[in-house]
Structures are given as structure tokens and as C-alpha cells.
Design a protein with these regions (language model features):
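Non-heme di-metal
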Residues: 1-319
Length: 319
């Protein structure tokens, strides 16, 4: 039986990794915004951040709150509808549920910091529409499903807004906004798991349909280029007032190019983007904070890494 063949019996699982590496890991890493203390963040916001830093953080956080619902719907409606296997559907429903937790948590941050007077930083509309058109698919043709799943998993879950996550993390490395930083850490670990398992599902599709990788190649390359364009424009918008004390826009753009290459390789394709390796390496702390070590180790998240048991690390160790 293949991925698209219905199996009435719950077990035995034909694709057990979507249970053990997907559903179970996400379940073990369950968290809620109520676990995060924001008292220190409010004090930092009122007493330590300057106006340009407030402008940056406030507009980023408002943008986050507007993006999570669509991501949840993709997992719970599209993926569940396409793949009848119980182990895949369970994983997708768990991932979608976790995205709703992100939405509530971002709203909590916005309310706690009082961000009603800020305007959300969002991806540039025309370019974002081009990307959405590549993700959008409502049919049942394997090529359409594979293209949509690959682009969504690799880029929407694995690259989109990672520049903003990195900006917010950079404050925690200065011992500021630790509550925001903790939430970003848990959120990015979730997104990274979702991306990893979605890419793996695409690779499984390619194993069962040997033409699929080539059939989707052009659209996926276009999507990768579009995502890098989106992120670079977004970085320009975030840094319109100038670089941060410990983070440069140029370094962040190189990091995004490197990360997009990594996701392309995860899908089974070759790297597409050239980048400044030294500048990109200035963001190696991002891999540490999101549950990996550096580079290729990032996607081999061990159960002890992907849990809340290890959250008490000293951020001075990053250096």
C-alpha cells in the first residue's frame, strides 16, 4: 500500500516515523504561554529598550500574530485531507494544534507589552502573493500535492520569518526580553520539526513516484527564489533604522540564503544560492538556541534536545 491508499485498521503503522518522530516529539514538547514569565520583559520594555528597538520588536510581534492561523489550517485541512494514513493524519493534526498555541502566545506577548499602537511588519504583498500561488493547491493530483507540500514545508515552515525570530533572539543574548526569547525558542523548535517532517513526507512521495522530484523541480526553485526575495525585503524593512548592536542586516541575509539551501537539500535538490559563509556563521548561535548544535546537526534533533527539560541553560555559554 502507498501513501494515498486508505487503511482502515489503526495499526500496524506503515510509516511509523510520522508517529515517533512527528506526533510523539511534538506531544512531548507541549507548552503554553502561561508558563512564560513576562515581568522582566515589561521592565526591559519600559526602562531599557530605546524607541527604535521598541519599533522593531513591536512591529515584528504584531506581524507574527497574523500569520499562524493559515499555517494551522494547512496541516489540519490540506495534509489531513490528502493523506489517509492514521499516523500521518495524527501528526498533521498535532502540528496544526501547536500552531494555534503559537497564535495565542503571540497575542499574549502583544497584550502584555501593549502593542496596540504599532503597525505589523508583514511580507511585501505582491511577492507574498506569488509565493502563496505556488503553495496553493486544492486538488488530488500527486504532482500538485507534492509541489504544495514541499514548498510549504521547506519554506513557509522552514525559512519564512526566521530572520525575525533571529532578531528577537538577539535581545535575549543581551539579557533583554527573556520571556519573548523563550517563547521564540519553543516556537522555532516547533516550526523546525514541522518543516523537517513535511520535507520527509515529500521525500517519501518521491520514493513512491520516481518522477515527482523532477516534475516539481522548477516550481520549487521559483518558490525558493521568491522566499529569499521576501525575506530580504523583510530584513530591509526591519533594519530601516539601522543595524542592531549585535546583529547586522547583511549577516541575516546570508543566513537566510544558507538556510534556504539547507531546506532545498532536505527536499532532495541541490543548493541554489551563493552566500558569504563568514557572515552567515555569525548566526551560528541561532542553531544552538533552536535545539541543534550547528549546521547539519540542526535537523538531527535528539529527544533530549527537543524537550523542555533542558531550558535552563546559561546563554553566556553560547559564546
Amino acid at each position: 500500500m502507498g501513501l494515498f491508499d486508505e487503511r482502515i485498521a489503526y495499526k500496524p503503522f506503515e510509516y511509523p516515523e510520522y508517529y515517533t518522530e512527528g506526533w510523539l516529539k511534538q506531544a512531548q514538547a507541549f507548552w503554553l504561554h502561561t508558563e512564560i514569565s513576562m515581568q522582566g520583559d515589561v521592565k526591559d520594555w519600559n526602562e531599557k529598550l530605546n524607541e527604535s528597538e521598541k519599533h522593531l520588536v513591536g512591529n515584528i510581534l504584531l506581524g507574527f500574530a497574523q500569520t499562524e492561523c493559515a499555517v494551522s489550517d494547512y496541516w489540519t485541512q490540506k495534509v489531513v485531507g490528502w493523506f489517509p494514513k492514521h499516523e500521518i493524519q495524527q501528526m498533521a493534526m498535532m502540528f496544526g494544534s501547536q500552531e494555534t498555541i503559537h497564535a495565542v502566545a503571540y497575542s499574549y506577548l502583544n497584550e502584555t507589552l501593549g502593542l496596540e499602537n504599532f503597525e505589523a511588519f508583514l511580507h511585501e504583498p505582491a511577492t507574498a502573493e506569488r509565493f502563496e500561488n505556488l503553495v496553493s493547491y486544492d486538488g488530488n493530483n500527486p504532482k500538485g500535492i507534492g509541489r504544495s507540500l514541499a514548498i510549504f514545508s521547506a519554506f513557509a515552515e522552514g525559512v519564512s520569518l526566521y530572520s525575525a525570530f533571529a532578531v528577537l533572539y538577539s535581545f535575549q543574548l543581551r539579557n533583554l526580553l527573556k520571556g519573548v526569547g523563550q517563547q521564540m525558542k519553543w516556537s522555532v523548535r516547533d516550526e523546525s520539526l514541522h518543516s523537517k517532517m513535511g520535507c520527509r513526507l515529500f521525500r517519501h512521495m518521491c520514493e513512491e513516484d520516481t518522477n515527482l522530484l523532477q516534475d516539481c523541480h522548477i516550481d520549487i526553485m521559483i518558490a525558493a527564489e521568491t522566499m529569499v526575495e521576501l525575506e530580504e525585503k523583510y530584513i530591509d524593512k526591519m533594519f530601516e533604522i539601522g543595524d542592531l548592536e549585535n546583529l547586522k542586516a547583511y549577516d541575516l541575509k546570508q543566513f537566510i540564503r544558507k538556510r534556504t539551501n539547507e531546506k532545498l537539500e532536505e527536499l532532495g535538490y541541490k543548493k541554489l544560492f551563493s552566500f558569504d559563509e563568514k557572515a552567515a556563521s555569525n548566526l551560528d548561535w541561532f542553531y544552538h538556541l533552536t535545539g541543534g548544535v550547528t549546521h547539519t546537526d540542526f535537523f538531527s534533533i535528539r529527544p533530549t534536545d527537543y524537550s523542555k527539560a533542558n531550558e535552563g541553560e546559561d546563554f553566556n555559554d553560547v559564546w
